[in-house]
Amino acid sequence: MTTVQHQVFAACPPDRVWALLADLEAVQHYNPGVRHAAVEGAQRSGVGARRSCDLLPKGRVVERVTHWEDGRAVGLEVAESDWPIHFMRWVTRVEPQGGGACITQSLEYQVKFGPLGWLLDRLVMKRKLTATLDAVFASLVRHAESGAASRPEGRT
């Protein structure tokens, strides 16, 4: 199993960050790799809620909420995808800090394909995933600080 940790600061109230995280469809606004996100079913929040994400340049993933602390933390897991993983799950937390918000995430996953998957993870996947999440968190912070919900420039 591989773990990836992130911590960033947003110069805005924590509730602004939480509003973006708690709206499961808002990921399409701050994640540059998501073309469109939609809640599946009637449940829009809390443990058991699901969202599907159409990805750029192609692909689709379905995620399920596994952890919910209103105003503070949301955890998700990949429920369906064609990625070469046995599982991927994460918890993102928001805490007040110095007049702003500290955002932390702990993500863990297991790559398929035994020793070959382990090697692929060490050589490519962890580095690529970390870089992707760096971009996601930078965009999340920009959106939270500006209060914007518009799509990143150049997105369709």
Task: Indicate where each model-derived feature is located.
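Generic structural detector for well-ordered beta-strands
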Residues: 7-11, 38, 52-54, 64, ...
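A short, structured loop/turn motif at beta-sheet edges
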Residues: 14, 66-71, 93-102
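Generic C-terminal helix-cap and adjacent flexible tail
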Residues: 142-156
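Beta-strand/loop substructures that line and gate deep hydrophobic ligand-binding cavities in soluble
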Residues: 80-134, 151-152
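Hydrophobic ligand-binding cavity/cleft-lining segments
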Residues: 1-40, 139, 155-156
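Short, charged/polar surface micro-motifs in flexible loops or helix N-caps
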Residues: 57-61, 67-74, 84
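Short, surface-exposed coil-to-beta transition loops
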Residues: 3-5, 59-63, 86-90
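Short beta-strand segments that buttress and anchor functional surface loops
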Residues: 49-56, 75-81
